[in-house]
């Protein structure tokens, strides 16, 4: 079962990476027209690769864990993307936002404890 949870973390990292690549692709539209297309396509290709790998690993997760446990654990994506957006893109986050992230992490912790 621990392997299943480690794979869920890998899925989260891959899909988070894919989301960050999509953000970079969107930002690349601000580049000069002569380089915009190439840069955007590279970021989008990397996003598709990461998201595709994430889906392949996710299928493996579904063989190992019940969906009712695996899917909520993907909420880790909210945490990872929030942290990455803050530090990589300097996006503002409020205290309320961080309380939400902490609530998600607490929920993941509560679900991982065996009764």
From Swiss-Prot:
One GO CC term on file: plasma membrane
Record membrane topology: Multi-pass membrane protein
Cell location: Cell inner membrane
Membrane spanning residue stretches: 1-21, 43-63, 65-85, 93-113
Organism domain of life: Bacteria
Key words, A-Z: Cell inner membrane, Cell membrane, Lipid A biosynthesis, Lipid biosynthesis, Lipid metabolism, Lipopolysaccharide biosynthesis, Membrane, Transmembrane, Transmembrane helix, Transport
UniProt GO MF annotations: carbohydrate derivative transmembrane transporter activity
Pfam families: EamA
Pathway, per record: Bacterial outer membrane biogenesis; lipopolysaccharide biosynthesis
Domain EamA: 44-113
Principal location listed in the UniProt entry: membrane
InterPro entries linked to this entry: EamA_dom (IPR000620), Flippase_ArnE (IPR022883), Small_drug/metabolite_transptr (IPR000390)
GO BP field: lipid A biosynthetic process; lipopolysaccharide biosynthetic process
Functional note: Translocates 4-amino-4-deoxy-L-arabinose-phosphoundecaprenol (alpha-L-Ara4N-phosphoundecaprenol) from the cytoplasmic to the periplasmic side of the inner membrane.
Family statement drawn from the similarity comment of this UniProt entry: Belongs to the ArnE family.
UniProt subunit comment: Heterodimer of ArnE and ArnF.
Protein name: Probable 4-amino-4-deoxy-L-arabinose-phosphoundecaprenol flippase subunit ArnE
Organism: Serratia proteamaculans (strain 568)
Taxonomic lineage: Bacteria, Pseudomonadati, Pseudomonadota, Gammaproteobacteria, Enterobacterales
